[in-house]
Amino acid sequence: MTLKELVVGFGTQIRSICMVGSNAFKKRETRMYPEEPVNPPPRYRGRIVLTRDPDGEERCVACNLCAVACPVGCISLQKAETKDGRWYPEFFRVNFSRCIFCGFCEEACPTTAIQLTPDFEMGEYKRQDLVYEKEDLLISGPGKYPEYNFYRMAGMAIDGKDKGEAENEAKPIDVKGLLP
């Protein structure tokens, strides 16, 4: 071992000690999580919830677009129909042990029924407890879009009623009558 190698080795040791010493008095970036609350950013994609429309009914119309858009296939549902012709999910299941929280289901939903909340604390001891059913996902409020009601906006026909006869729906305009 030469004198040059000793000086270089000693210099690197001194540089490392100085670096550790300079960082010892800086502000810590690590948060002590359970004691200090963590505030996620405003557009954080966390747990999935199902919302209700302003009338208190389920917004989900079981169109199955969310399940098709999901890249990992963690959403499953079965469509059923009420007496007045409206669709609803007979069951709606999300497997959070597979979910990657990408938000594709929220983007695909035409009724804004699926919304992602900033809730991220979903630790469980058994994987089966991470499979949420419709009752676990439904919240009492309308979520991010309080005034939106899919059936009023879409103008979908309801059993026994023609277009324009449903609640809060105008008669269709005869386009041919507008021609000169």
UniProtKB/Swiss-Prot annotation:
Q: Quaternary structure?
A: NDH-1 is composed of 13 different subunits. Subunits NuoA, H, J, K, L, M, N constitute the membrane sector of the complex.
Catalytic reaction annotation? a quinone + NADH + 5 H(+)(in) = a quinol + NAD(+) + 4 H(+)(out)
Query: What family does this chain come from, according to its entry?
Result: Belongs to the complex I 23 kDa subunit family.
NCBIfam families from the xrefs? NuoI (TIGR01971), PRK05888.1-1 (NF004536)
**Any one of the GO CC terms:** plasma membrane
Required cofactors, per record? Answer: [4Fe-4S] cluster
Q: Which organism's genome codes for this protein?
A: Pectobacterium atrosepticum (strain SCRI 1043 / ATCC BAA-672)
* Domain 4Fe-4S ferredoxin-type, residue spans: 50-80, 90-119
Q: Signal peptide span per the entry?
A: none
* Protein known as: NADH-quinone oxidoreductase subunit I
Annotated localization:
Cell inner membrane
Query: Keywords on this record?
Result: 4Fe-4S, Cell inner membrane, Cell membrane, Iron, Iron-sulfur, Membrane, Metal-binding, NAD, Quinone, Repeat, Translocase, Ubiquinone
EC number, UniProt record = 7.1.1.-
Q: Which cysteines are joined by disulfide bonds?
A: none
Q: So where does [4Fe-4S] cluster 2 get bound?
A: 70, 99, 102, 105
Regarding the membrane, this protein is recorded as: Peripheral membrane protein
Which HAMAP family does this chain map to? NDH1_NuoI
